[in-house]
């Protein structure tokens, strides 16, 4: 029989047996094998005892892709719908305006931010060249910004500008721009980055009823208003919005001090850096380098070049001779005054619709804020910059209303977070610590370089924006205090955006001295309190966009202002010509004796002349007036009339000073110093200044229907024109003007109502769009987040699947190996069964043989016993026989011993006898010898 694997002691070193060690580990018994050598030959060799492990086979991988060479599901990620897809889809849109507006390319910028502050509290974030670090926002000095103002194009002949500067016209007002293009700027509350859909088209005629709430969301600076009037006056081309090159920011950081002085002293209307409108200009790198090298010269040339783009008339430009670095040593009253050029005569205006139709189609970038209708405000400067002391003019105000209003304004403006803050866009070169100096002149500190004042326009076109520029319920008496003529400017020009008050009390006094179109003539506080309640209610934060831009506007608008014709409804005379203005050298402060040098040596009685023209002026002083006429050496010649009705000055308190007079462009009138603070320059207060009870500022305005005396007429003509009319004539003229003002107020209210309706519609639409944008943003973010999560999970599942496949392949390999081993084990078991049967047969044979051997053993045992018995008997017989023989031998031996003993005795006796004989013989011999 043949055996395969018996046990460990019979197994050899076989590979098959080695693989069985895991499942069948034979144990050694230590017993010798009972198999025959022929059976041992059939066994495999005995394996070496070793501990083996179940190992998974490493799958084959592609040497290039390192992927497992097994079939698996393709790991293709799902096509995720990203925000870029929305951007690409939006870029493929081609929206169109109504038939009056031709379709133009759409510029869309979409970006998503996680920060979603309330869109109703955020102002419009314009796309300017600012680099604001909101983490270090408290350390920012907003009055020394590192970003250059968006000036006019640097040079008129620069190749980077796509349009000639002389043919460009800056930002159109909001109501006209709503027809010319649609620019949707998604505020930072929703997307934190603008989604601007921009259209440009042929401008249609603009009616008065198109005054919309865009004035609230898009505050226009003086240059923006002037641009609108420039569009009405001449057919200029609309300037393209061109992005500002990034190098400008770097140049601004390098030459910030230089740019602060030279930044647009004659800034063109195309850029309104004091407000939220920004008309970016394309500046190439070479332009930026030239701007860096020769900043001041470039800024001056820019101002001159862009001023010519407004109108063919020269623009008066003011220059102040002082060094801002030596500001502590400067005496503002000895700076020589503002060297103001003579203003040219105004020119007629053409109907706006006729001129706007001829404007060249250019895309104009405009931004809409569909908030809840707030005037887009700027956040006040960071509180860590230190508080400025109040000016004396603000400190002397008797009325507490401005303080209450300023507290409300401060609370209101303090609401926006630091992320919403918009850094003021003007740069200043004065120290705030100098405001406690009584000799400090805030208007002589270099000023900000802001766009010039606007041209005049019909009153009816702009009345809605007079009191409805904002819609918040908090009315500010301070804003109406410091800009009493702004209402008239808005009624006459319709587009002057009042500067925005920052909300701090110390800043309010600064804004009062720096309001747009303000002169330094004092305004009675009663005039502001007499304003109609409707105006106070609908003039929410008649905020001056920023105090700093306001101060810049005051000086800059006086420097590059094109004097338009005052558009009164029934004006009786035109503005004075260049010959009627004083020379710049005569604007210095001089004593009265030097002024009236021809015999009139006594000082002018200022108090009397100040009270002239007011309701405190009594007819009893006509005698005094006649005395002045009689003894005035200037009356030697016949009086000359430079204008009709030049004596018509207000004699009663007005609702607002600008309700009576139309706004005269600031460049035509210098800043007349306050009576109580500064001495009179060359008798200008004789020419129509009237007494005020407060130190606030008053705008020297041109009347809508009655002209004011020109303060720049020669001294003799001015005094003659002032004194030749009686108080009754002036009262009658003022009454007529007041009636006309009341009519205008009614029109203002009507336009207010229309504006409020449109404004509410815009507010609702803005809220809807804001919510819609927020929803879209949230949906996009959620979708993006879900897709990213799903993508991560899918990648994780794919990795797990791949790992499971690898494990499965290894398990399959291991299982196949185990199966083979199992088959071998089955074969081994069959061999063991066969061996068992063989062993059983052997055992039976062994038992039979054992029985036979036992029988043989018994037989052998009996035979051996018999043999032993016989041997024993023989041994006993031999023993007895030997015993008897031994006894006989012993007796014989004893007998022999006795013989020996007897012989020994006989020998001894013989020897003794021999010895005795010997001795005897010896003795005998001796004796014989002796003998």
Curated annotation (Swiss-Prot):
Gene (UniProt): tacc3
Predominant localisation class: cytoplasm
Residue ranges, compositional bias (Basic and acidic residues): 549-558
Any single Pfam family the record assigns to this protein: TACC_C
Family: Belongs to the TACC family.
Reported function: Maternal RNA in oocytes remains in a dormant state as masking outcompetes eif4g to bind eif4e, thereby preventing translation. During oocyte maturation this complex dissolves and eif4g binds eif4e to allow translation of maternal RNAs. Plays a role in the microtubule-dependent coupling of the nucleus and the centrosome. Involved in microtubule assembly during M-phase. Involved in spindle pole assembly by recruiting and regulating ckap5 at the spindle pole leading to microtubule elongation.
Any one annotated GO CC term: cytoplasm
Subunit structure: Found in a complex with cpeb1, tacc3/maskin and eif4e. Interacts with eif4e and cpeb1. Competes with eif4g for binding to eif4e Interacts with ckap5-a; two molecules of ckap5 interact with 1 molecule of tacc3 probably mediated by coiled coil domains forming a four-helix bundle.
A single BP term in Gene Ontology: nuclear migration
Coiled coil stretches, renumbered: 775-930
Record-listed Phosphoserine modification sites: 33, 620, 626
InterPro entries reported in the protein's UniProt record: TACC, TACC_C
This protein's record includes keyword Cytoplasm: yes
Compositional bias of kind Basic residues: 381-399
PANTHER family in UniProt: TRANSFORMING ACIDIC COILED-COIL CONTAINING PROTEIN 1/2, TRANSFORMING ACIDIC COILED-COIL-CONTAINING PROTEIN 3
Subcellular location: Cytoplasm; Cytoplasm, Cytoskeleton, Spindle pole; Cytoplasm, Cytoskeleton, Spindle
Residue numbers spanned by region Disordered: 28-51, 257-282, 299-423, 439-568
Record key words, sorted: Cell cycle, Cell division, Coiled coil, Cytoplasm, Cytoskeleton, Mitosis, Phosphoprotein, Protein synthesis inhibitor, Repressor, Translation regulation
Single GO MF annotation: translation initiation factor binding
Polar residues composition bias: residue spans: 260-277, 338-360, 449-471, 529-541
Identification of the protein by name: Transforming acidic coiled-coil-containing protein 3
Modification after translation, per record: Phosphorylation by aurka is required for localization to mitotic centrosomes.
